[in-house]
C-alpha cells in the first residue's frame, strides 16, 4: 500500500469536508430555529386588528375530486371577517368531478363569496403558475393567500398570517407551517412528517431568525397583491413557483417571514413511486430557480440573499455529490475493491456525522407538540439509512431532468401529485 494520497483519498477528503460543512451550517440553523421557537411561545396574535384587509384565497385545482371538498369547506370555516374574504378556486382543465363538487358547495353556501374559475386546455392547463395567474387576475383582495387543493387549514391560520404581515411594511409575504395529515398511514408518511418538521424548524425558522430570509412553500402563505402585479404574476416556466417568487420578492427589497402558529394540514404521498415523482419535480424546479438567480451572488445590491443561494446550491450540488460519492466509496471499500490511505479513525467521523443528524432532527421534533417521543427518535435513526438514501436518488434524478429539459427546450407542465 502506498503511503501517499491517491485519487480515492482526495475524493474521500472532499466528501468528508463537504458533509461536515453542511452539518455545521445546519447546526447553526437549528440553534437559530430553536431561538425563534422560544420567541413564538410568547407571541400573541389573537388581538383583533382595527381594520382587516381584504384577502383573496387562491386554490389551484386540477382533477382534485378526492380532496377539494374538504379543502374548500375548511376555507369557508376560516376565522376571518366574511365581508373581507373571497375564495377563488381555479378548476384548471379538470376531467373528473372537481367542478360538480365545487358547484354543490356553492349551492349549499349562498352567503359565501366562493368563485370558481373553470378553464380548459386552451385557457388553462399551463401548470400551477398559470392557474395562479388566472386566479389573481380575477381577484379583488389587497392580499393573496394560496392553499393547495389538498389542504385543511386550521381556523386561525389565515388570521395569524394577516396579523403578522400587518406589523411590518417591509414584509412582502408571510408563510405558515404545513403538517402531514396522513402521517400515521405508513412508514413513508411517518418519515415525511419528520422531514417536513425538520426542514421548517431548522431551515425556515433558522434562516428567518439569523438572516431574515425565508422561502415561500407551495401553500399556507399570503403575499401583497400589489407586489405580484409589479412582478407580472407567477413565472409559468417555473415548476417550483413558490421558490421562484420568493427570490423575486427578495429582489424588490422585501422580506418573507415564517409564522409557525399558522398551521395547515396536507396530504402527503403514500407510495414511494408518487413521492419520488413529486420530490424529483421539486428538485428540478429549485435548480431552475438557482440557475436563474445565481448572478445575484455577485451583486452588492442583493448580497443579503447570498446565503440562500449558497445554501441551496450546496444542498443540490456540493452535498448531493459528496453523499453519493461517499456511499460508493463505502460500498467499494467494504467489498475490498478499493483502498485509501488517509490516516485517522474515519469510522468515528461517520458515526459522529450520523449522531449529529439524529440530534438535529430530535431537536426539531422537540419543538412540535406530540412529536418528541421514543418512536419518532427511532424513526429518525432509521431514516438516515433508508429515506435519506432514497432522497439522493430523487435529487440526482431532478438535476438530470433539469439538464435534459433545458437542452431539449421542454416547457413546464402540470404534474399533479396523486391523491389518496
Language-model region placement:
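Acidic donor-binding loop at a coil-to-helix junction in glycosyltransferase catalytic cores
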Residues: 239-245
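Catalytic donor-sugar/metal-binding loop of nucleotide-sugar-dependent glycosyltransferases
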Residues: 246-264
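Long helical/loop segments within the catalytic core of UDP-sugar-dependent glycosyltransferases
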Residues: 109-111, 115-142, 155-239, 280-291
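Cell-envelope/extracellular polymer assembly enzymes that use nucleotide-activated donors
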Residues: 53-56, 86, 229, 244
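Juxtamembrane C-terminal module of membrane proteins
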Residues: 28-52, 295-312, 328-420
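Acidic donor-binding segment of Leloir-type glycosyltransferases
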Residues: 73-122
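N-terminal signal-anchor transmembrane helix
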Residues: 29-84
Amino acid at each position: 500500500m502506498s503511503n501517499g494520497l491517491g485519487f480515492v483519498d482526495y475524493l474521500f477528503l472532499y466528501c468528508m469536508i463537504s458533509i461536515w460543512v453542511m452539518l455545521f451550517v445546519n447546526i447553526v440553523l437549528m440553534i437559530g430555529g430553536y431561538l425563534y421557537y422560544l420567541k413564538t411561545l410568547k407571541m400573541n396574535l389573537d388581538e383583533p386588528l382595527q381594520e382587516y384587509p381584504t384577502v383573496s384565497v387562491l386554490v389551484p385545482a386540477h382533477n382534485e375530486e378526492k380532496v377539494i371538498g374538504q379543502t374548500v369547506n375548511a376555507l369557508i370555516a376560516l376565522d376571518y371577517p366574511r365581508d373581507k374574504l373571497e375564495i377563488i378556486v381555479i378548476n384548471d382543465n379538470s376531467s373528473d368531478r372537481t367542478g360538480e363538487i365545487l358547484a354543490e358547495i356553492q349551492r349549499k353556501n349562498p352567503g359565501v363569496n366562493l368563485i370558481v374559475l373553470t378553464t380548459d386546455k386552451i385557457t388553462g392547463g399551463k401548470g400551477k403558475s398559470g392557474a395562479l395567474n388566472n386566479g389573481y387576475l380575477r381577484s379583488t383582495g389587497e392580499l393573496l393567500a394560496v392553499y393547495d387543493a389538498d389542504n385543511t387549514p386550521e381556523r386561525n391560520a389565515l388570521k395569524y398570517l394577516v396579523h403578522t404581515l400587518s406589523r411590518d411594511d417591509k414584509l412582502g409575504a408571510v408563510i405558515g407551517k404545513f403538517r402531514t395529515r396522513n402521517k400515521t398511514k405508513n412508514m413513508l408518511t411517518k418519515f415525511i412528517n419528520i422531514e417536513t418538521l425538520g426542514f421548517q424548524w431548522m431551515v425556515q425558522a433558522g434562516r428567518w431568525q439569523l438572516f431574515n430570509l425565508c422561502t415561500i412553500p407551495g401553500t399556507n402563505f399570503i403575499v401583497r397583491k400589489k407586489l405580484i402585479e409589479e412582478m407580472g404574476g407567477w413565472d409559468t416556466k417555473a415548476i417550483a413557483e413558490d421558490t421562484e417568487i420568493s427570490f423575486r420578492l427578495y429582489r424588490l427589497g422585501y422580506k418573507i417571514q415564517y409564522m409557525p402558529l399558522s398551521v395547515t394540514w396536507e396530504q402527503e404521498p403514500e407510495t414511494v413511486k408518487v413521492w419520488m415523482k413529486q420530490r424529483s419535480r421539486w428538485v428540478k424546479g429549485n435548480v431552475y430557480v438557482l440557475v436563474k438567480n445565481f448572478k445575484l451572488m455577485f451583486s452588492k445590491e442583493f448580497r443579503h440573499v447570498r446565503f440562500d443561494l449558497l445554501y441551496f446550491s450546496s444542498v443540490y450540488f456540493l452535498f448531493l455529490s459528496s453523499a453519493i460519492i461517499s456511499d460508493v466509496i463505502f460500498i467499494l471499500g467494504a467489498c475490498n475493491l478499493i483502498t485509501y490511505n488517509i490516516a485517522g479513525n474515519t469510522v468515528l467521523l461517520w458515526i459522529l456525522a450520523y449522531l449529529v443528524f439524529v440530534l438535529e432532527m430530535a431537536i426539531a421534533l422537540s419543538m412540535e407538540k406530540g412529536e418528541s417521543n421514543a418512536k419518532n427518535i427511532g424513526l429518525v435513526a432509521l431514516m438516515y439509512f433508508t429515506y435519506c438514501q432514497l432522497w439522493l436518488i430523487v435529487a440526482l434524478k431532478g438535476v438530470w431532468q433539469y439538464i435534459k429539459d433545458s437542452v431539449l427546450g421542454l416547457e413546464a407542465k402540470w404534474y399533479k401529485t396523486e391523491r389518496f
